[in-house]
Amino acid sequence: MYKKLVFIFIAALMGACTSRQQADEKTLYISILPLRSLVGEIVGDDFKIEVLVPPGASPETFEPTPRQFIGLNRAEMIFNVGLIDFETTLLSKIEERGKVVNLSQGIELIAGSCSHAHTPAKQAAAGGDDTSCAEPHNHSHAHGVDPHVWTSPRALQKMAQNAYAAIRRAYPDSAKYETNYKRLQADLRALDARTGEKIAQSGIEYFIIYHPALTYYARDYGIRQVAIEADGKEPSAKRLTQVIRQARED
């Protein structure tokens, strides 16, 4: 009996220590998975990075767990695209609004189609003007803003700049973050140049994609995106025929 009590006491003590360590651990929250590596390249292993929307889940139907909501309020910083509905709804409830970082700030935004549940243009990041989609079959009337800014290496450079600016404000004495950021920007600039060069050499004028997720990529590199999907619905036989005919003719 004595040995059993000692074992229970030690187990409880270890559990308390683990809980204390978890509470003391500095955590950053990221809204969607594509942003994780961007922020991680700057901060390295100094923070635990939590992603809100798990792999395979849809941001359009995502709802945070109670544990995630508690974690958000305890987080050092929260990085988000700033253009997806769940971000606007969820992050407006965060007590410390100053720790929420909008990574799309300053990017020239593109009007989205109604195939997405996106933040309306009037609620989108300041500093970006809506433009028509780079894809000819996309509706340009008011259905919000296309949020897929991270698909363009050119836009990623601005997102990295926004992330670093926020991190530097919070941790001005860390020279390591500046070094990491400069290395990241050099890599992104090289990727941008290489992408533009390869596309120019290929002579590609457009590409066909099921879901219109590469609008910023198409815009930034002077090509057109032809989406098979229309307004979030499966394509009709007529639409499929149009796309096939266009591909054959070109």
Feature locations, PLM:
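Generic N-terminal leader/processing signal
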Residues: M1-Y2, T18
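Extracytoplasmic metal-acquisition and chelation regions
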Residues: C17-D250
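Hydrophobic h-region of N-terminal signal peptides that target proteins for export
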Residues: I10-T18
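Intrinsically disordered, low-complexity segments enriched in polar/charged small residues
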Residues: I8-F9, Q123
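Sec-dependent signal peptide recognition
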Residues: Y2-I8
